[in-house]
Structures are given as structure tokens and as C-alpha cells.
From Swiss-Prot:
One of its GO terms (cellular component) is cytosol. PANTHER family: NUCLEAR PROTEIN LOCALIZATION 4 (PTHR12710), NUCLEAR PROTEIN LOCALIZATION PROTEIN 4 HOMOLOG (PTHR12710:SF0). Coiled coil: none annotated. The modification Phosphoserine is found at S104. The keyword Phosphoprotein applies. Keywords: Phosphoprotein, Ubl conjugation pathway. It comes from Arabidopsis thaliana. This is NPL4-like protein 2. Pathway: Protein degradation; proteasomal ubiquitin-dependent pathway. Belongs to the NPL4 family.
């Protein structure tokens, strides 16, 4: 016997099969029997992007599991493998037996009971963010560090900055990494208010704003059972709620085993659901996570309604709304040493950076967020920092006063 994990809009479920020798047709029959989804409504794929399909035409692009006679073993699927499922319509998910009526002839309902019945947790189908596009240099600088320097052994995070279009498309053009302490399971942000003021001043001059948070999961996390852990959901909800931006994006970088047995770096993007943010703001989440707690479940202080059940533990997948990922080449580079890492930026690094491309105008050399942040330490945060960043945005000549200051800084090493 083997177990296959099936991820759909309803979350993560499991189907039991005899073995990898069964065909796609037999698997669909098992899904119909065990998950109550009719055969003719099922679309299966090994590609997670299936869950982003919005129209029947979109579903036609996923053809890897359309041959009914194809054995699962030919796709290297086995015990514990993940498949993605889309289906039309609604289904009834089995729940707890009905409760006895409240009132004179049943159990009395408290005010908390009534509030809980109004707090119904359902899957949010549509995100407020149409897509998120990562600047290639910024994304590569982040993933390269967690892969090559940290070996995905500890967690690392950063705030994403960029723009949001009227259509809800988010573009990420730089990633700011605050002071932090990462372990195998937790990420503690030791935020520096003064440094964040400088970051926001640079963003203002560039015509950008904070649009999300990115972090990596570690190789020791048991990611076979969850997309985000309970601790990750809490942190993501806290930062999303703090932002007050409805298009706020949470991005995850992870290492996944490929078909050849090697490992690939993979990006995923989500929005925390409206209900998740509401529950966080109204303090329904249990914020103390115990060692024995199941990481795929978020604990509530009071019962909420999930399906037909009153529960105090909610599958984390109910709080996640998948977001489509794109990429682009933005206006900034990411070649200057990045803040708050083990190797710190220095005046010598500034001189090396400026000397590297002597033929370029200074504004081109300054078109690097991490360099702007380093220089911003020596400028007035309310006037000089946004003014210098605006020069970068407009690609206009850097005023002589700033140019002389930057040159003198570089020459002190």
C-alpha cells in the first residue's frame, strides 16, 4: 500500500492506493471514492501551477496526467508523492455528527459559542494580488545567499519593496534584510527602527513601497506535511497585518528534490487570507507554540467553524491563497554587499564598487539599493536620502555635494 498526497483548493488530503503500478484512471477512481469528487470533474497534474488555473481553458495546459492508461510509476510517483487537483463545483466534506439543538431542550449556548459560529474559516479562492514579479538580481542575491552561504540550514528573511499596479500586480525591485537571528525552525527579526526609516526614505525617493516579506524554509523542516508551519503562518500574518496593504505578498524559498535526485531552489508566493488577518488582528491565534504541537495546524483560543465542525485547530492551508510568480529586470542592481549579513559593507567595499565601472556616470553606480542604504547612514534621512534616491529613479546627475561626500567616503579606506 502507498499514500499519495493530494493538494486542492480545499487543502492537503490523502488517498490510499495499492502501489505505483496503478494507472491514472485507477487513481481518479480512488479520488472519486475517497474524496467524493466525480471522475468527470477532476483535473490532475504534478505541476503546482494547476491551482492557479482560473478557467477551463487554463486547465487544458496541464496534460501530464491526461492519459488514463499511464502508470504512476512512469512519472516517478510513489509513496508520499504530491499531486495537484482542480475540480469544478462544490463537494460535501464529511464532518462531525450534528450537534444537538441549542435552547431549552439542548445545551445552552454561550456568547463565545455565538461568536465562534460567526467566525467561519473557509478557503479564499481569489487573492487581492494578481501576480508578483521578482527582479531577477534581487531574487538571485537572496536565494544564492541562503543556498550557498547558509546551505538552507537556518532561516533568513527580508522585506520586499517595489510597486503595486491598479490591477493588483506587485513588482518586487529590491529586498531589505533586517538584523535577524535564524535557526532551523524559527526566524527572529531584531528590527532596527532607524535603519528602517532610511530604507523607507530610499523607497520613497525611488517611487516604491514595502510590498511583502520573503523567507526560506530549511532542509530540516518536515515540509512533506505542510506548506507553511504554524510559526510561519503567525509571522506572515503579523507582518501582513502590520502593512495594511491588501496586495501584501508572502514569498517562500525552499530546496526541493527533483526527478533526478538532485535539489532545485524553488520560489512560492502566497497571500494570507482575509480571514487569517482578521483572526490575527482580533487575537484568536494562540501565539505560544509548544514543542509537541502539530506544525501543520494553527491553534485558536476559541472554536471556529471549519466546514461543519467546531474546531480549535485549523489546517494552515486554509489561510493561504496562491499567487502567480513572474520575473523582470528592474532598474536596480544588487552587487554591493548586502546589509546585516556576516560580511559587512565597508568603505573599502564602497571604493571597490565605484572603481569597478569608472566609465559609468555616478548615478548608474548608485543604482543599487544596498549601496544607497550604506551611504544613507551619513545623510539626513528626511531630505538628503530621498533626494539621492530620486536621482536614481530619474537617472539624473547626482548633485555635486552628494558626489563629493560619496567620493570622500570611498577615499577614507
Amino acid at each position: 500500500m502507498m499514500m499519495l498526497r493530494i493538494r486542492s483548493r480545499d487543502g492537503l488530503e490523502r488517498v490510499t492506493a495499492e502501489g505505483a503500478h496503478i494507472t491514472v484512471s485507477q487513481l481518479k477512481t480512488l479520488i472519486a471514492d475517497q474524496l467524493q469528487i466525480p471522475l468527470h470533474k477532476q483535473t490532475l497534474s504534478t505541476n503546482r501551477d494547476l491551482l492557479l488555473a482560473k478557467t477551463p481553458a487554463d486547465l487544458l495546459a496541464f496534460t501530464d496526467l491526461t492519459d488514463p492508461n499511464l502508470p504512476l510509476s512512469s512519472l516517478n510517483l510513489g509513496h508520499g508523492s504530491m499531486l495537484y487537483l482542480a475540480y469544478d463545483g462544490e463537494r460535501s466534506i464529511p464532518g462531525a455528527p450534528p450537534v444537538t439543538p441549542a435552547g431549552s431542550f439542548g445545551r445552552k449556548m454561550t456568547v463565545d459559542d455565538l461568536i465562534a459560529r460567526q467566525m467561519r474559516v473557509t478557503r479564499q479562492e481569489t487573492s487581492h494580488c494578481d501576480s508578483v514579479s521578482f527582479d531577477r538580481d534581487a531574487a538571485n542575491a537572496f536565494q544564492h545567499y541562503v543556498n550557498e552561504s547558509l546551505a538552507f540550514a537556518v532561516k533568513r528573511g527580508g522585506f520586499m519593496y517595489g510597486t503595486v499596479t491598479e490591477e493588483g500586480q506587485v513588482e518586487v525591485d529590491f529586498i531589505y534584510e533586517p538584523p535577524q537571528q535564524g535557526t532551523e525552525a524559527n526566524l527572529i527579526l531584531m528590527r532596527d527602527a532607524d535603519e528602517e526609516k532610511r530604507v523607507d526614505a530610499i523607497a520613497m525617493g525611488l517611487g516604491m513601497r514595502r510590498v511583502g516579506f520573503i523567507f526560506n524554509q530549511t532542509v530540516v523542516q518536515d515540509k512533506t506535511e505542510y506548506t507553511l508551519s504554524n510559526a510561519e503562518v503567525l509571522q506572515a500574518a503579523e507582518l501582513h497585518a502590520e502593512s495594511e496593504l491588501k496586495e501584501w505578498v508572502t514569498a517562500v524559498v525552499k530546496l526541493e528534490v527533483n526527478e533526478d535526485g538532485g535539489a532545485d531552489v524553488h520560489f512560492e508566493a502566497f497571500q494570507m487570507s482575509d480571514m487569517c488577518i482578521r483572526l490575527f488582528k482580533e487575537e484568536w491565534f494562540e501565539t505560544e507554540i509548544m514543542p509537541d504541537d502539530d506544525p501543520k495546524l494553527s491553534k485558536m483560543k476559541k472554536e471556529v467553524v471549519v466546514g461543519v465542525k467546531d474546531l480549535k485547530e485549523v489546517d494552515n492551508d486554509f489561510f493561504l491563497v496562491l499567487v502567480r510568480i513572474l520575473d523582470h529586470q528592474g532598474p536596480l542592481s544588487s552587487t554591493f554587499p548586502i546589509e546585516n549579513r556576516s560580511s559587512r559593507a565597508t568603505m573599502r567595499a564602497l571604493k571597490t564598487h565605484l572603481d569597478r565601472a569608472k566609465s559609468l556616470p555616478l548615478v548608474k553606480k548608485m543604482s543599487d539599493f544596498h549601496l544607497l542604504l550604506f551611504v544613507a547612514q551619513f545623510l539626513d534621512v528626511s531630505s538628503d536620502v530621498p533626494a539621492l534616491a530620486e536621482c536614481v529613479r530619474l537617472q539624473s546627475p547626482v548633485p555635486e555635494g552628494y558626489a563629493l561626500l560619496i567620493e570622500s567616503m570611498a577615499n577614507t579606506c
